[in-house]
Amino acid sequence: MKKLMTLLTGGLLLAAVQLSAQTAAAKPVIMTTDGEEIRAALVELTQSGDFRYAESLKDGSPKLSIRKNRVRWAWIPKPEEITKADNLLKNKKYDEAATAFAATAKSFGPLGWEPYSKLRQAEALDASGKQSEAIKVLETLKDYANVSPRNEADLSAAYELLVKFYANIKAWDKGLELSKKLMYAGDAAAVSALFARGDILSARASETNSQDDRRDAFNDYAQISLLFPKSSRAAEATFRAYQTLTVLNDARAQIFADKLKKDYPKSDYAKQL
């Protein structure tokens, strides 16, 4: 798979992606407001924000155009610039990574990569001790409208991270409000929403010693454990449910301990029992 990004002197910001014909699922996609799905070989974004695309590599440079107000969302495979920013973050070059992700959020945001870029930018900022800046970055996603199946998980992860930051600064109401917003998305978002709500309720309970908050947090973790057993986070949720009930001196804690050992015996959480 080859990926091409060029800045055209004629005033076009080209985010073009060349893909093998065998990898149809990884082709750039433009979803129009009337529900038409356009699978392209090349996609470019003009400086005015409109889209140009080519349906086949044989067509040469993109000639077909579509106005931005007719695009519900667009997506291209991960650009090389984002992979480079990932490596900066992985190598703990946090300031450089934050700057790089800020740039990719701007350049590739309309092409589906704004949630991912801002999530990673916030992680880099937080790692360098700039949590307040990280919060501001994530808050720009609160009204994000270009949600697609390609970036929904990244958006949910960004919201969940923002809820955790709100918990850190004791902005309980903001965190709970945002977790409610997550509830109305798909299953993956629902798991994130339940975790986010459970975590902020647990954090508030630690501060206020509210048993009601602890019980509500348990309900959130238990829902993930029982309703989404195949989720990659089910073991963690089961452990959190066990922990919360233990703090509440509730005998049902053993039920979740047994479930954790039975259903997720190789998980790190089962090893902590």
What positions do the PLM features span?
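Bacterial N-terminal signal peptides that target proteins for export
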Residues: 1-9
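Intrinsic disorder/low-complexity segments enriched in polar/small residues
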Residues: 3-4, 19, 23
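Bacterial N-terminal signal peptides
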Residues: 8-16
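Compositionally biased alpha-helical segments
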Residues: 21-148, 153, 157-169, 173, ...
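Terminal, low-structured helical/coil segments at or just beyond the last alpha-helical repeat
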Residues: 212-215, 235, 239, 245-273
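Amphipathic alpha-helical interaction surfaces
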Residues: 227-230, 266
